[in-house]
């Protein structure tokens, strides 16, 4: 079986789709794990570099449900197209197996492990891409996010009781 130019282009598209899957998955965990209160604390802190990164992310997080819907919608579309393309290039079941393996390892596990540790750094660099995607998907994601806003109410930041704050301080002193 000879590899054609169309096949080569398809494999390049597959690599790009896996990269976008990784981006969506990692950012979903990374950005949604940063609440507005935490970002405000970082922005008011003494580390200027971290404050700048938090300042870039905060406007996205102010529309948390829209951000969530955008990232999830993008991830689903990319992963569905990846599976279809892989199935066309291989036998159906083999394509399903390959696409599932690629999505789990390169589109989920690795990016989520990375973005959970480096959410500010990765998230702040991805703000321009996410902003474009929010604009592109807006007609679909905005109505869904409005339903979530109505059903769930305003997003609450992390609020600690006095006991929890005392324990948090104790843990920080020990580290």
Tell me the role of every PLM-derived stretch.
Residues 1-175:
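Membrane-embedded alpha-helical segments of inner-membrane proteins
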């Amino acid at each position: 079986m000879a590899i054609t130019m169309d096949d080569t282009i398809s494999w390049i598209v597959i690599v790009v789709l896996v990269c976008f899957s990784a981006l969506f998955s990692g950012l979903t965990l990374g950005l949604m794990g940063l609440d507005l209160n935490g970002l405000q604390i970082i922005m008011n802190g003494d580390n200027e570099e971290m404050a700048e990164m938090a300042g870039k992310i905060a406007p996205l997080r102010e529309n948390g449900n829209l951000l969530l819907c955008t990232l999830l919608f993008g991830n689903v579309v990319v992963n569905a197209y990846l599976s279809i393309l892989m199935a066309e290039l291989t036998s159906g079941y083999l394509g399903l197996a390959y696409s599932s393996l690629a999505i789990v390892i390169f589109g989920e596990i690795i990016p989520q492990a990375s973005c959970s540790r480096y959410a500010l750094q990765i998230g702040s660099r991805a703000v321009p891409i996410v902003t474009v995607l929010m604009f592109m998907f807006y007609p679909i994601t905005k109505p869904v996010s409005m339903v979530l806003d109505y059903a769930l109410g305003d997003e609450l930041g992390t609020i600690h009781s006095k006991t929890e704050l005392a324990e948090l301080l104790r843990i920080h002193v020990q580290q």
